[in-house]
Amino acid sequence: MAERLTKTAARNVFYGGSAFFFAIFVGLTAHSHYYIRTVSTDETTLTEGVARGKHIWEKNSCINCHTLDGEGAYFAPELSNVWIRWGGDKDPSSARDALHAWMAAQPSGIEGRRQMPQFNLTDQEVDDLADFLQWVSKMKTQNWPPNQAG
């Protein structure tokens, strides 16, 4: 057995290793795509209200202050679990009423506290935002973000 690696052997190791890791990369990419499409996000529950709520979320730049699944600014509370924190999983109408009241009461005017601006959303827009937050709360995020307090 040769004590040195020949050019042919080195080339074979390079091509074999490259092919192996390329196959691993393709496999992991396909698995991630499959997981996202079939498990993580349930497209069957997407409604027009959810889509309009997402549009309201983006139009008003909510992510500039809030986080959603850990993404966004950390100025205001995490909102991916606000629907559950407000009891929407047990009593959706009370959670909707709470969201309507919260949005109508902003800014709260409490001195020294961070203030959420008044966006003057219509009742339909608040309902659509509630649909979006309800949909987000049902995404399977593998317990991310770790801070559930909001």
Whereabouts are the PLM-identified features?
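Extracytoplasmic electron-transfer domains, predominantly the class I c-type cytochrome c fold
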Residues: E48, H55, D69, A73, ...
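Short N-terminal secondary-structure initiator segments
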Residues: S18, G53-K54
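Local sequence-structure signature of Cys/Sec-based thiol-disulfide redox active-site neighborhoods
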Residues: K54-N60
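Short cysteine clusters
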Residues: C62-C65
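Post-cleavage N-terminal segment of exported redox proteins
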Residues: M1-E48, W102, F132-G150
